Amino acid sequence: MRLNGDSGPGQDEPGSSGFHGGIRRFPLAAQPEIMRAAEKDDQYASFIHEACRDAFRHLFGTRIALAYQKEMKLLGQMLYYVLTTGSGQQTLGEEYCDIIQVAGPYGLSPTPARRALFILYQTAVPYIAERISTRAATQAVTFDESDEFFGDSHIHSPRMIDLPSSSQVETSTSVVSRLNDRLMRSWHRAIQRWPVVLPVAREVLQLVLRANLMLFYFEGFYYHISKRASGVRYVFIGKQLNQRPRYQILGVFLLIQLCILAAEGLRRSNLSSITSSIQQASIGSYQTSGGRGLPVLNEEGNLITSEAEKGNWSTSDSTSTEAVGKCTLCLSTRQHPTATPCGHVFCWSCIMEWCNEKQECPLCRTPNTHSSLVCLYHSDF
C-alpha cells in the first residue's frame, strides 16, 4: 500500500479516498488539522524545554540558566523533533490529528535528508539568525568605539600591499593581504549599517510570514516556512467527515492587510524622500548664503566655536555611554531595557523569564505581570 498526496483537484475531496489501480489515495490534510497539530507540537516542545531548563538550573544555577535560556529552548525543540520526525515517526500533534508527512510528486514518506532539512529549518535557523543579529549589533557598538584602530589598520594596510613582489610568494602574500583588507572593510561597513538595516529586516520577515500564512489559508499546504522550504506536506488518514472546513476567507483578509501595509510603506518612503530633499535644499541655501548665524556666548562671555561644541557633544556622548547600567539579574549590560511598575529596569529577556516563575519585582517584591512591563527605547538608566 502506497501513499499519494498529489492526487489532483478531484481527489482532494473527502469522497475520493479508495482503491484505484491498487493505490490508496488519501486526501490532503485541511487547514484546521494542520494548525491544531502545530499547536500541539509547540505545547509538547515547550514541556521538554521547561524540563531541560529546570535540569540545567539545578545543575549550574539560576544565573547561568538565564544566560543560556535560548540554548535550552533550542535543545528542547531539537530533542522533540529529532525523536519524532527525525526517527520517521509522527509527532504527538500529528498523531492527535490523524495526519502524516508526505513529500515529492508521488506523496511518499519524506526521506531522512528531507526530514533533517526540515528539523534544521524549524529549530536551528531561527536560533542562528538571532545569534548573528545580536552579535552584529554588539560589534557595531564596539566598532564605533574603536574607530582609531580601524583607521590605523586602514593606513598601514596599503604599505603591505605596495611592497615590491620579487617572487611568487610575495605576490600571493600581497593578494591575500589585499583580499583580507577588502573583506575587513566590507565587514566593517556592513556591521556599522546593521542597526539601521535590522528594523527593516524584521519588517520584511513579518511580511514574509504573513504572506506564507495567506498562501496557507488559500492552498492549505505549508503552515510553516520550514515546511515550505523542505517541501513537507500532510495527508489525512483518519475518518473522513462530510464537511471539512476551509479558511480561504482568512486568506482574503490577510491579502487585504498586506495590500494596506504595502501602500503604507510606499507612502512613508515617498514622504521620507520628500523630507530629505527639503532638508538638503535648506542646508544648501544656508551654506550658500554665507551667514554663520547668531554668535553664542558661554557664561564667561567668550565666543563658543564649533570645535568647542563638538568637544562638548563628544564628552556628553562618552558620559552617556558610561552611564548605561547593568541588569541585576544577569549582571551584564542591559539588552532591551524594560521597566517594571515599581521603576526598576532589567533586560527584557531576564525580567520576562523571572515573571514566568514569580510575578513580582526581583528587587522590591512589588507584584507585577507580563502586561505591566514596559520596554524602554532610545533611553537607559
UniProtKB/Swiss-Prot annotation:
Result of altering H344L:
Embryo lethality
Q: What class of enzyme is it?
A: transferase
Q: What induces it?
A: Up-regulated by hydrogen peroxide.
Instruction: Let me know which tissues express this protein, per UniProt.
Output: Expressed in roots, stems, leaves, flowers and siliques.
Copy the pathway line from the protein's UniProt record.
Protein modification; protein ubiquitination
* Positions in the Cytoplasmic compartment: 61, 155-178, 267-381
- Catalysed reactions, semicolon-separated: S-ubiquitinyl-[E2 ubiquitin-conjugating enzyme]-L-cysteine + [acceptor protein]-L-lysine = [E2 ubiquitin-conjugating enzyme]-L-cysteine + N(6)-ubiquitinyl-[acceptor protein]-L-lysine
Membrane topology category: Multi-pass membrane protein
Where would you find this protein in the cell?
Answer: Peroxisome membrane
UniProt-annotated binding residues for Zn(2+) 1: C327, C330, C347, C350
Task: Recount the known activity regulation.
Answer: The E3 ubiquitin-protein ligase activity is stimulated by PEX12.
List residue spans of RING-type Zn fingers: 327-365
GO CC term, one of those recorded? peroxisome
State the superkingdom: Eukaryota
UniProt keyword annotations, A-Z: Membrane, Metal-binding, Peroxisome, Peroxisome biogenesis, Protein transport, Transferase, Transmembrane, Transmembrane helix, Transport, Ubl conjugation pathway, Zinc, Zinc-finger
Please list every transmembrane segment annotated in the UniProt record, as residue ranges. Answer: 31-60, 62-83, 113-154, 179-219, 247-266
The family note in this entry says:
Belongs to the pex2/pex10/pex12 family.
The name under which this protein is listed is Peroxisome biogenesis factor 10
Q: Which organism is it from?
A: Arabidopsis thaliana (Mouse-ear cress)
